[in-house]
Design a protein with these regions (language model features):
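Structural signal for interior beta-strand "rungs" in well-ordered beta-sheet cores
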Residues: 2-181, 185-186
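Single conserved hydrophobic/aromatic residue that forms the stacking wall/gate
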Residues: 118, 226-234
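SDR active-site lid
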Residues: 184-202
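An accessory alpha-helical subdomain
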Residues: 197-224, 228
Length: 234
């Protein structure tokens, strides 16, 4: 159902079984897939690409121009995958000439007031807490949990299966599988609960723990270490 009070540009492409509430604004050069729900007062702006099965709550703004003074109106996009929940007042900016696109994967929950800046990449299966702000060109790998009111500096990367504690702020990368928190942010152990929920065996979790013990006790620099996703065994 499409509300007669919504505005949809004639050049926008809308898939099948899409529910669009009153006072929704959908700009030109927008592509929206099937089975999406877009609630009242959401704005889907120029260059947005929305996959299938997403739920977009009131006040969300997707595809606004980047907050970057170097932006000169380049043809860039904000790309959203499938089955995401994007809550109230979330803002997802378009990319810049640097990378051309801002990407949010699939099966993510972005809670109220989250900001995703230009050229950011968020993987799949992530949870981003209320009022968390992510600067330009950050990367969040799959299955990470970023708690509420976290401030993430430009160019930082958060590894997969990480838990970042609420209210943290950081300007350096966070390696995978750990809990990070405190002020200044620091390693706070392995994300054991999160790893078990994702099917990691006790043996594998212990191997990850031992790896980080070696890294941190020897003062090693993570830039010299390659950490790949392990093969999980039941």
């Amino acid at each position: 159902m499409i509300s007669p009070l919504a505005y949809i540009h004639p050049e926008a492409k809308i898939g099948e079984n899409v529910e669009i509430g009153p006072f929704v604004f959908i700009d030109k050069n927008v592509v929206i897939g099937d089975n999406n729900t877009i609630m009242p007062n959401a704005n889907i702006l120029y260059g947005s690409r929305i996959g299938n099965g997403n739920t977009i709550f009131p006040g969300a703004v997707i595809g606004a121009i980047p907050q970057d003074l170097k932006f000169r109106g380049e043809e860039t996009t904000a790309e959203i995958g499938d089955n995401n929940t994007i809550r109230e007042n979330v803002t997802i900016n378009r990319g810049t000439a640097a990378k051309g696109k801002t990407i949010v994967g699939s099966n993510n929950l972005l809670m109220e007031g989250v900001h995703v800046a230009h050229d950011a990449i968020i993987g799949s299966g992530c949870i981003i807490g209320n009022a968390t702000k992510m600067a330009g060109e950050i990367i969040i790998d799959d299955n990470a949990i970023i708690s509420g009111a976290v401030l993430m500096h430009q160019f930082c990367r958060v590894g997969g299966y990480v838990m970042v504690q609420g209210g943290s702020r950081f300007s350096k990368d966070i390696p995978p599988y750990i809990i990070a928190g405190r002020e200044p942010i620091a390693y706070a152990g392995i994300n054991i609960v999160g790893l078990r929920r994702r099917g990691f065996s006790n043996e594998l979790i212990e191997n990850i723990h031992n790896t980080y013990r070696i890294i941190y006790q020897n003062g090693m620099n993570l830039s010299l270490i390659h950490i790949s996703e392990p093969t999980r065994r039941s």
